[in-house]
Amino acid sequence: MKKTIVLAYSGGLDTSAIIPWIKDNYNFDVVAFVADIGQSKKDLYKIKEKAIISGASDCYISDLKDIFVKKYVFPMLKTGAIYEGEYLLGTAIARPLIAKAQVDYAKKINAIGLCHGSTGKGNDQVRFELAYSALAPSLLVIAPWREWKFQSREDLLKYLKTKNIVTNVNKKKIYSRDENIFHVSTEGGILEDPWNPANEDCWFWTKSPLNAPNKPKKISLKIEKGCVVSINNKFFNEFNCLKRLNKIGAKHSIGRIDIVENRLIGMKSRGCYETPGGTIIYKALRSLEQLVFDRECMYWKNKIALQLSSIIYDGKWFTPIRKSLQKSSDILSSSISGKVVVELYKGSVRILQKKSLNSLYSKKYVTFGKDNVYNQIDAKGFIRLFSLSSRIRALKNKK
């Protein structure tokens, strides 16, 4: 009986080529493992058949949609993690869950190893293999992009042709696309030159701002402990909440970014990322934090968010430091409850209204009109003490 490898299978060009390549070079059976994390249903319907045609002995589809949003996406959004000021980590946050589910399935069927289709130039190879190391250090890991002779996706197309395996990718439209319920990314093709403008082929979900509605859209979000629980007074679970906001946001061109980012391994890469629902939630949560957090809480929350963004981007999900920082962030976010009204218009998210029972904002204290709660003379003593070190230094230098 042949030994079995479990491949994290997407149905795309790379993983379709990996199946026959492993059979040719390792003489292992390949079981394709597909994580359903909310990508297009149209793709999922065809994916099992495609895996078998490509040579897989079996294809297992694991429904991870709800757990992905509930245990990964929403907790991350609550932290405020955002990489290099723009990227909401839509691909990075999916990798730990896919790897964990893949490992669990490999153990269940007594497979001897794991395989992924990440390139030797990218971040995902690190993310997958850090998770494998944390969860199943004894299993064999195969990373074909670091072994095979193919140098490009064009080479893969030629290889699949020799195997009589049909793919819907062609040389003119050779983008690498990654999709889940939270985010879709497009890389490669014309995007490899930063001087090339991204055309509409590079955008998969969202309408162009030019074609978005001319009338702004207002939506009301209820937030409890850092999580959106209702949209326009209709309650949804986490998955359906994100799905609904994606639909609304995509129509209004929300969540498009075209960025050059610093990869973990040292090089820069360019991608077009779409995160419509996530962008709306991110903006709403940060807006409510402005009402609720004092200066010190805001400082530490932002610092934790910055650290977590790198930890998640680098694939260090299954580490004590990620768990510790996230727990700290959860404690801070326990007071983030309230209501936010946002306006969506041709790619922009504008906060119109916000309120919270935990708000530290006091109109009585900040009014420019007459008030009876704040004695402005008190500021004199505060400033004198606050400037003490500066005055001592100045007096010393004067000597």
UniProtKB/Swiss-Prot annotation:
An annotated GO cellular component: cytoplasm
Enzyme Commission (EC) number: 6.3.4.5
Keyword tags: Amino-acid biosynthesis, Arginine biosynthesis, ATP-binding, Cytoplasm, Ligase, Nucleotide-binding
Chain residues that bind ATP: 8-16, 35, 117
UniProt-listed NCBIfam families: argG, PRK00509.1
Family label: Belongs to the argininosuccinate synthase family. Type 1 subfamily.
Protein known as: Argininosuccinate synthase
Native source species: Buchnera aphidicola subsp. Cinara cedri (strain Cc)
Lineage: Bacteria, Pseudomonadati, Pseudomonadota, Gammaproteobacteria, Enterobacterales
Gene: argG
